[in-house]
Design a protein with these regions (language model features):
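Charged catalytic and DNA/RNA-contacting regions of genome-maintenance
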Residues: 2-324, 333, 337-353, 357-442
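A secondary-structure boundary/capping signal
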Residues: 33-34, 456, 468
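Short intracellular "coupling" helices and adjacent cytoplasmic loop segments at the cytosolic face
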Residues: 328-329
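Cytosolic, long alpha-helical scaffolding segments
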Residues: 375, 396, 400, 463-478
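Flexible, glycine/threonine-enriched loop-and-boundary segments that flank and lead into catalytic domains
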Residues: 435-455
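Short, surface-exposed charged micro-motifs
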Residues: 134-136, 452-456, 464
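Conserved small/polar residues in nucleotide/adenosyl-binding loops
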Residues: 481-487
Length: 487
């Protein structure tokens, strides 16, 4: 059965809500949270059961026949989502917004995030040595504006391209952009070739971001074409990620005279970043040169190879740094040793800014920050620009985070006891809540003199104090206020 064939007046409230969500997020597969599972229905169930080889079942939803259904355990969802993303699909995560035990009627649910090939955040789904770019193309009749970003690192770029379909497509392939948003004026040939020939996730959207709360990103940009291109991409990110993009760096305008012009065919024939034989990194120039110690360095080297400098002053400046490190061989080796201990700070900061970081990320951040003073000492000794002082942040992590916490934030045991008094009290309530209520009940009986005073709980009112009518005379206004504050 297809969704469009269902009589919505007969659907159960939950299934009607699902159908309404699907109408809103038509181009996505909705993972609908039901208890410990994400369920899919109608066409989504048929598609996902085929793509992921899941068992297709059915669900009673008020209709004469059962609605197609399949599901996955929520705790293993990342594996299944990753498979769907690699096949070019978008996944909308519909979460329960309240505790089912406390819900009145149907549990409130809504889409909290849309995951696509250009908006993946999970480190397990990303290649640490490559950027994961998402871009937008806006047609200005005589030129195209391409804006692209890696939301995991915050890097943001924009450039103007010739009004030539082949050049635009080649540029997208050259940059390795994983997802593209196009405005409706863009020639549909670009849309279809990117989607059908190159399996790049594509969307046709005209909306632009109307606010001005990201003006710091474009503060030095005067060309309105760049600004429009940025806001076209930004709107898609904010709407689909359901979160702020405050970590985006100031936009970098790429101009043709800054770098050596090179098309995708030159890049392939020279085997700069992948071999022609199997299109793998191995045996390419990048593979040969990449002896970097961090994921950040590997991505930077790849960018340098793909965009060779042509400005003499910039080239000489880069040579000067290389020359210093060659002369200071012992210091260089010591620096490489310390860099090896640094995790991927760009993506760690990205996950923290996007509020998806876990305990492991915080520990990696702490261990990385611990090494920075040693790196700064070396930079200072060769009169090079030092890194910012982050000692206060490092100390905060030392004081607050356990050495070996569980990976998941919901498991607890992340923040040390004694770091925050209010949190300690909440922990005590959670682990010994019944003891707290019993002790509170005894204290209130002694304080008020009401021997039959009881502390109760229900879903409607929460915790409450119960006394008999005969004891009302002992309840004063001061007593009422005191009880309200303490319960």
């Amino acid at each position: 059965m297809k969704r469009c064939e269902a009589d919505r007046t007969k659907l159960s409230p939950m299934m009607r809500h699902y159908v309404e969500l699907k109408d809103k997020y038509e181009d996505t597969i909705i993972f609908y949270r039901l208890g410990d599972f994400y369920e899919m229905f109608f066409e989504d169930a048929l598609l996902v059961s085929h793509e992921l080889e899941l068992t297709l079942t059915g669900k009673q939803a008020g209709l004469d026949e059962r609605v197609p259904m399949c599901g996955i355990p929520y705790h293993a969802s990342e594996i299944y989502i990753d498979k769907l993303i690699k096949k070019g699909y978008k996944v909308a995560i519909c979460e329960q917004l309240e505790d089912p035990k406390m819900a009145k009627g149907m549990v409130k649910r809504d889409v909290t995030e849309i995951i696509s090939s250009g908006t993946i955040i999970s480190s397990n789904s990303l290649n640490e040595k490559e950027n994961n770019f998402i871009g937008s193309i806006v047609d200005f009749k005589y030129c195209y504006v391409l804006t692209y970003t890696d939301i995991t690192t915050g890097e943001l770029y924009c450039e103007i391209l010739d009004h030539n379909n082949s050049k635009v497509i080649n540029k997208i392939i050259f940059l390795g952009i994983k997802e593209v948003i196009l405005d409706s004026n863009v020639d549909k040939e670009i849309y279809h070739k990117l989607r059908d020939n190159y399996r790049i996730t594509t969307s046709l959207i005209d909306d632009i971001y109307e606010g001005n709360d990201y003006d710091r990103v474009i503060k030095n940009v005067t060309d309105t074409r760049y600004i429009h291109g940025f806001k076209h991409l930004l709107n898609y990110l904010v709407v689909n990620q359901k979160r702020n993009m405050d970590h985006l760096e100031e936009i970098v305008i790429k101009k043709n005279d800054d770098y050596l012009k090179m098309d995708i065919h030159t890049k392939r024939n020279l085997e700069l970043t992948e071999s022609m034989r199997n299109k793998e990194r191995m045996y390419s120039l990048l593979w040969l040169l990449d002896d970097t110690k961090t994921a950040m360095g590997s991505r930077k080297l790849k960018s340098w190879i793909e965009f060779p400098l042509v400005d003499k002053d910039k080239i000489e400046k880069r040579y000067d740094v290389v020359s210093i490190l060659n002369q200071e061989f012992i210091l260089c080796e010591e620096l490489r040793k310390y860099l090896y201990e640094v995790y991927d700070l760009e993506r760690l900061c990205g996950r923290i800014a996007l509020k998806t970081a876990n305990a492991r990320d915080l520990l990696q951040l702490k261990k990385s920050l611990e090494v920075l003073p040693k790196i700064n000492d070396i930079l200072k000794s060769i009169n090079y620009k030092e890194l910012p002082d982050v000692s206060s942040l490092y100390q905060l992590l030392v004081d607050s985070i356990y050495e070996s916490p569980p990976v998941g934030l919901k498991e607890g045991y992340l923040i040390k006891d004694g770091f925050n008094k209010e949190l300690d009290e909440l922990k005590d309530l959670r682990s010994g809540g019944k003891d707290f209520i019993s002790n509170f009940e005894i204290q209130e009986r002694e304080r008020t003199g009401i021997k039959n005073l009881k502390v109760g709980f229900n879903k409607v009112f929460g915790y409450y104090i119960e006394i008999s009518k005969g004891s009302l005379q002992f309840v004063t206004e001061i007593g009422r206020a005191s009880c309200r504050e303490r319960v």
